A protein has these predicted regions:
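Elongated, amphipathic alpha-helical interaction scaffolds
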Residues: 1-328
């Protein structure tokens, strides 16, 4: 059941999906946040992740989603989590959410037999908002309609309506976030990122961190460092941890990130120099033969590219430059 299988592009998506695509993390959080009667009816032990994303492609930098199925009585229902990490309120969010729900139903119909008695599964929509401020919107689709005064009763049969569960991290104190250790630490960290509070004690709760899987701990540290925090404060915070194993892991991840950053910098520098060499040749001699252009663009040795840039500026002909390339 899927609209697309696009890769994760955003750090918020990566951390959110790494944690909450695991049914045990999603179930432990959702059963505490959806209405009590619904939570009691859902068989959370059989919560199953469905593949795909239903979000508009141009909005995937601001939102991500997960779809689950689970039994309620003798029927399956769907639980849809829309994670909004945009920093502004969207008054028409319910309309966009409805669009995603329609896509889910259409996909469901494609994947299931459509006999005369076919009926759509109920979707329990949940919106998780990361914004640092509380939103003023009402989580009720019917509230979007401009119904003429005095006509509410007459028009009620024609006004579609559904509600969604709105969970706002801005309104949840750190200690009120419930779930598994991994789920709690992911949401605490995401909440703190919006308020520039990533060194707060709840984000470094050792009693929970020691229970978090290693791959999630690594993503948490990468997420924190990716927020461009003060590196000296990070080092001080890590050194204050009592668990030596956590200290070691955090600093190892930080070292890996620095090494990756240097490698990316070298790669980007090589690509820029290669483009500069080709541009210099084009300015001086016009069209650059494709084989020569391809050869230059695959080079990543910065020293060699710098030499070739000087050669490109000084050489008398493309043929002379080609000989220079051959000579290294």
């Amino acid at each position: 059941m899927a609209m697309s299988e696009d890769p994760i592009h955003h750090p918020h998506d990566k951390l959110f999906k790494a944690g909450f695509s695991r049914s045990e993390n999603a179930a432990a959080f959702l059963r505490e946040e959806v209405p009590a009667a619904v939570a009691e009816a859902v068989d959370w032990s059989r919560l199953h992740l469905e593949p795909g994303s239903f979000i508009d492609s141009h909005l995937r930098g601001f939102a991500s989603d997960l779809l689950f199925s689970a039994p309620i009585g003798d029927a399956d229902c769907l639980v849809y989590i829309l994670f909004e990490h945009q920093t502004r309120e969207e008054p028409m969010l319910a309309l966009r959410l409805l669009r995603y729900m329609v896509r889910i139903w259409e996909t469901w119909l494609q994947n299931h037999s459509q006999g005369r008695g076919a009926r759509l599964p109920v979707i329990v929509p949940v919106v998780l908002a990361q914004d640092s401020k509380l939103w003023s919107l009402t989580p009720d689709f019917a509230c979007l309609f401009d119904v003429p005064a005095g006509q509410e009763g007459n028009l009620a049969p024609f006004v579609p309506g559904f509600s969604f569960q709105l969970i706002e991290l801005a309104g949840l104190p750190f200690e009120a976030i419930r779930g598994t250790p991994a789920g709690i630490m992911i949401l605490r960290t995401m909440k703190a990122e919006r308020t520039a509070d990533l060194f707060a004690d709840p984000v470094w709760d050792e009693a929970l961190l020691v229970q978090v899987p290693e791959e999630i701990f690594e993503l948490l540290v990468r997420y924190i460092l990716g927020a461009d925090v003060d590196k000296e404060r990070f080092r001080t915070r890590v050194n204050s941890l009592l668990e030596v194993d956590l200290q070691t892991k955090a600093m190892t991840i930080a070292d890996q990130l620095r090494a990756e950053g240097r490698q990316e910098g070298r790669q980007e520098g090589g690509e820029a120099l290669a483009r500069a060499v080709v541009s210099a040749l084009e300015v001086r001699f016009g069209k650059v033969p494709e084989d020569l252009r391809a050869s230059i663009k695959t080079m990543r040795d910065l020293d060699r590219l710098e030499r070739l840039l000087r050669v490109a500026i000084e050489v008398e002909s493309i043929e002379d430059f080609r000989r220079g390339v051959g000579g290294g």
